[in-house]
């Protein structure tokens, strides 16, 4: 099976800069900015379950979009995500999607 090698990071978010120009930023930059903002508001407190919080914020919309893309075909969605179908079903149930 041939693996796709994109020439640029396809996971980008298009935003407008101060000059109203469109700028593509990698998803990771937006996640980093959101985490920086979140952590700055903790006033020295240590968060708990931060990993689960961030994962759920990304995983839920990802599953939603993949299920839409595959028109609900769980086998195809699981293959796209690189997980087995049982794991996909468990994740869909976790987010009330299945």
Swiss-Prot record:
Pfam families: HTH_8. The gene is fis. PANTHER family: DNA-BINDING PROTEIN FIS. InterPro entries: Fis_DNA-bd (IPR005412), Homeodomain-like_sf (IPR009057), HTH_Fis (IPR002197), Trans_regulatory_Fis (IPR050207). Residues 74-93 bind DNA. GO terms for molecular function: DNA-binding transcription factor activity; sequence-specific DNA binding. This is DNA-binding protein Fis. Homodimer. The lineage of its organism: Bacteria, Pseudomonadati, Pseudomonadota, Gammaproteobacteria, Pasteurellales. It comes from the Bacteria. Activates ribosomal RNA transcription. Plays a direct role in upstream activation of rRNA promoters. Keywords: Activator, DNA-binding, Transcription, Transcription regulation. Belongs to the transcriptional regulatory Fis family.
């Amino acid at each position: 099976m041939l693996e796709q090698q994109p020439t640029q990071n396809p996971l980008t978010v298009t935003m407008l800069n101060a000059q109203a120009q469109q700028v593509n930023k990698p998803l990771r930059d937006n996640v980093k900015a959101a985490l920086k903002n979140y952590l700055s508001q903790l006033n020295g407190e240590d968060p708990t379950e931060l990993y689960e919080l961030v994962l759920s914020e990304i995983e839920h919309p990802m599953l939603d979009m993949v299920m839409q893309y595959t028109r609900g075909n769980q086998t195809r969605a699981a293959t796209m995500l690189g997980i087995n179908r049982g794991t996909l079903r468990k994740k869909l149930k976790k987010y009330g999607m299945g």
